Structure formats: C-alpha cells, structure tokens
C-alpha cells in the first residue's frame, strides 16, 4: 500500500459522505480516477436507484482524457458491485474501461457481492489492492455494515435531560431541536413507546431540517389506536423489535423515547450510538433519564447555546 493510495482514498470517503441523505438504503460510496498523479475524474453515489460512484466518476472524465483510463487507477471506498440490481454491475464497467489498477477501501458485506466484484476485476487482469483505510471505510458505512453483517438495523438512541436528570419537560432549544430533526432525516425509521405516544401525540416527522421523514413505529404490548401512517410493534422484547424492523428492510432506526424503552435498548446492548442532550435548567420532574451502560464510550461533546450534546458509541 502506498501513501498516495491513502490520500486518494480519503478523497473517496470525503465524496461518499455527500450521499448521506439520499443514498440509503444503499451504502455511501466515493470514487476517484487518477492518471500519473492527477485526478481526472471523481464521483459519488448520489441517490438510491441512480448511478453508482464508479459510474459517475467515469462519466466525469472529459472526452480528451478517456483514452487515459487504460493507464489509470480507480479508487473506490467500497468493493464494486458484481450483480444486476437497479443498475448494472460496476465491476463490469471497470473491466470494459480497461483500468490498469483498482484500489478498494473495504469488501462489500452484501450477500450478492462479498468478494465477487474483486474476483471479477482480478479475473480480467486488473491489479486490485484491497484494505486501504479499511476501518475508516467501514465506519463510513457502519449502518449498512450492521444491517448486512449483524442482520439488524443500526440503532441510534436519543434523549434530552434536565440538569437534575429528568426527561419529562421542555429541555431542547431551537438549535438542538434542529439537530434532532437532522437525525430524523438521516434514519429510515423512528421508534417511541406507548406512554410517549399517548402523552405527547408526536408526529415524529422531519420539519425543521431538509430531508425525508422516517417511518414511525410505536412499541406497545397493549392494543392501541394509531394514525394510519404509524406502525405498531406489539412486542417489548428488543431482539423481537429489531427482527421485525429487519424484516421490514429498515437499516437505521432512531429511538426517541420514552425512558423505559430507551433503558431497555441500553440494557440489551443492542444499540450502536447514543446522543444525550443535557439542559442547564432544573425541572424537578417525575421521570428520570435513562442510565448509560458501562459499554457507552464518549466520543464527542458539542456545546449548543447553553445545552450540551454528548455522543456515545457502544464499545461492546
């Protein structure tokens, strides 16, 4: 592996992040085409059902540079697909273009790929390097990797608590509310418990941020009248909940409450990231905030106009 390989792979990762909102449920992927130390094309997967990163990178190459592809290296953050889905196989495209070399960040865990794209390139005589910035490329698509590797959705927990540790009150400010809606737009589904649904009658949609609204689910072991666009999960068992969401093809779920449901997820260990907003006011409420598990690893703290938002990852 060359130092220059890492430089261009970092650019692939940077490009891939542009697909956060619209690429899902597909992975975020970036691609860069390099000839003689110069980038002559680049692209990323913009939207599910549209051209993949490799397709867009090839399309960005000017006509006068197309003859250089046979002496070029293409960098891609995820293994090129080898199957027909909504678009043709990218591995076939790279073979047809005659690339000299292909550098791949990480292998695709999707059952239809899993090394087949890499093998197809090698069988065609293309020099293939795999594993450049592998961990960074896997983290880029931790949601996709979790869904296809662990056969469950990527789970994000979120709550806001007062300075004295209660969650039953108005705590968020305008900025942190905007962050909350940004996270909603980044997830395919949103989940609340019965008590939260009956007390707050939440719409659970995305209003103060650009993007789609997640599919709303309510967890209740009791019969419950819900709006037509809501979905009822009639088991409070966390593995059962996640299995149902997996069968519904939900790759990412945001759990917003209430305290009982959040604590159940935390205690089960079946969560991936957690955002805790800490307010500055004392409200002397009646519902205590969930307690973080020993597996919760603090990775960042953001100060937002008097509020503190801490991000934790499950290190288990």
Mark where each language-model region is.
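Zn2+-dependent cytidine deaminase-like catalytic core
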Residues: 33, 38-136, 264-266
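Short, charged/polar low-complexity linear motifs in solvent-exposed/disordered segments
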Residues: 58-60, 147, 187-188
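Solvent-exposed, charged interface segments at domain starts and junctions
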Residues: 89, 129, 133, 137-144, ...
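Short acidic loop-to-helix transition motifs that present clustered carboxylates
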Residues: 110-113, 135-139, 197, 237, ...
């Amino acid at each position: 592996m060359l130092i220059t390989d890492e430089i261009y792979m970092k650019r692939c990762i940077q490009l891939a992040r542009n697909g956060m909102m619209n690429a899902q449920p597909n992975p975020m992927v970036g691609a860069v085409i390099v000839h003689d130390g110069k980038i002559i094309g680049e692209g990323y997967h913009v939207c599910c059902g549209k051209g993949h990163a490799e397709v867009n990178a090839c399309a960005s190459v000017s006509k006068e540079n197309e003859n250089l592809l046979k002496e070029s290296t293409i960098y891609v953050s995820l293994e090129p697909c080898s199957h027909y889905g909504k678009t043709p196989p990218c591995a076939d495209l790279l073979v047809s273009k005659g690339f000299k070399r292909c550098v791949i960040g990480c292998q695709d865990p999707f059952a239809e790929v899993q090394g087949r794209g890499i093998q197809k390139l090698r069988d065609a005589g293309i020099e293939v390097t795999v594993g450049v910035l592998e961990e960074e490329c896997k983290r880029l698509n931790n949601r996709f990797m979790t869904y296809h590797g662990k056969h469950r959705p990527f789970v994000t927990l979120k709550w806001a608590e007062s300075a004295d540790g209660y969650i039953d009150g108005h705590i968020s400010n305008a900025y942190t509310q905007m962050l909350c809606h940004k996270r909603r737009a980044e997830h395919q589904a949103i989940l609340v418990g019965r008590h939260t649904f009956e007390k707050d009658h939440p719409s659970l949609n995305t209003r103060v941020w650009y993007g789609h609204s997640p599919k709303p689910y309510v967890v209740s072991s009791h019969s419950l009248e819900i709006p037509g666009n809501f979905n009822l999960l009639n088991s409070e068992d966390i593995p059962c909940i996640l299995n149902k969401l997996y069968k519904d093809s939900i790759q990412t779920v945001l759990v917003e409450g209430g305290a009982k449901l959040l604590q159940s997820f935390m205690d089960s260990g079946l969560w991936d990231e957690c955002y805790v907003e800490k307010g500055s006011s004392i409200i002397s409420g009646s519902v205590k905030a969930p307690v973080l598990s020993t597996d919760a690893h603090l990775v960042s703290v953001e100060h937002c106009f008097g509020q503190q938002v801490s991000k934790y990852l499950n290190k288990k």
